[in-house]
Amino acid sequence: MKSFAACAAAVITLIASLSAQQPRILTVDHRVTVQSTVPALAGKAVELYVRERYSAAMKVTAIAPERVVLFVHGAGTPAEVAFDVPYTDYSWMAYLANAGFDVFAMDTTGYGRSVRPAEMGEPCNLSPEQQKQFIPTMIPAPCAAKYPGQLTNLGSDWNDINAVVDHIRALRKVEKVSLIAWSLGGPRAGGYAAQHPDKVHKLVLFAPAYNRAAAAAPPPLPNPGVVFNTQSRAEFDANWDRQLGCPNQFDPAVREVVWREMIASDPAGAKWGSGVRRAPSTTTWGWNAAMIGGTKIPTLIIAGAQDRQVAPERVKAAFDDLGSPDKVLIDLGCSSHNAMWENNHTLMFAASLEWLTKGTVNGSRSGVVQMGYPKS
């Protein structure tokens, strides 16, 4: 495997600050090489995309160890879209960068600008229902899958995360990084942290897809199931709309920017039908009551009250089972599974900053904190 210096080619773009009071925020694109454990790519050296953002006023070569953060995405949206929306103050990455953090976000295999297995270029590997939207433009009729199961798995995701964490640790000469994760990023980041507590400082988990009864060991891989999936603009909108419970919960202009960035992250998918986002199906296991119960890392967990993808009760279960004495659960009102793109995003961002810098939320190191609900 090539050295980290050779593996991570960086292209630097200067980004204008949103206000005259804020310093310039730099963006650096890295390519990190990993020996893949994805069954379809097993043993191959492949590249993962990592985005970095930091203030031009900061000397990153002398960064404080507790100020290095890595974002980990969920099941569908790549990290650079989820956490770096280029619209007013909606970039979580830029928010933390402005606060003096060196901020990274990674795409695991099959997502965004990271390596995509060839199996994701075959419409026959979609579910029969999703195949319908590509008949007859891409396939003449329904067809059988050409790969035997789900494309990626938690083990391969943990392997990807470890490669990026080690790259960051070597790059910034720190022992630990903090992880911020969304949705399926919960098992990815939380499971990784449980297995590598020596490399993780703190955790922030938004809507973690927790299953306290998850199997402790993986099934034979690849696990039978749909290989990968797509999401169209209409599906993206409908999924968000079903989670709206408050007036003016989000700015419609944000949705336009998010979808634009989503399609830009998948140039091949942009040419499928009216344009889709592609993502691998992922086999999960391991991040269960036993694993999370043994986790002692300080952890902030956030649940959106209107979330219809990872129910608040499921998030509360993760909080209850977590073994760390330093743990806070935020019950975030008027917020969906997409809260970082909604009007309460500023509350989330500020809470994450307080947690990362002080280990508290509103001054508390443990317990449940409500915020974001309409004032009576």
Which role fits each region the language model picked out?
Residues S335-L347:
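Catalytic histidine-centered segment of alpha/beta-hydrolase-like enzymes
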Residues C143, A213-I302, S376:
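Alpha/beta-hydrolase
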Residues L322-N338:
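Catalytic histidine neighborhood in serine/cysteine hydrolases
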Residues Q21-A64:
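N-terminal cap/lid segment of alpha/beta-hydrolase-fold proteins
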Residues A57-A105, V115-M120:
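Short, surface-exposed "cap/lid" segments of acyl-processing enzymes
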Residues R308-R314:
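Conserved alpha/beta-hydrolase "acid-adjacent" motif
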Residues K132-P148, T152, W158-K176:
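Conserved acidic catalytic loop of the alpha/beta-hydrolase fold
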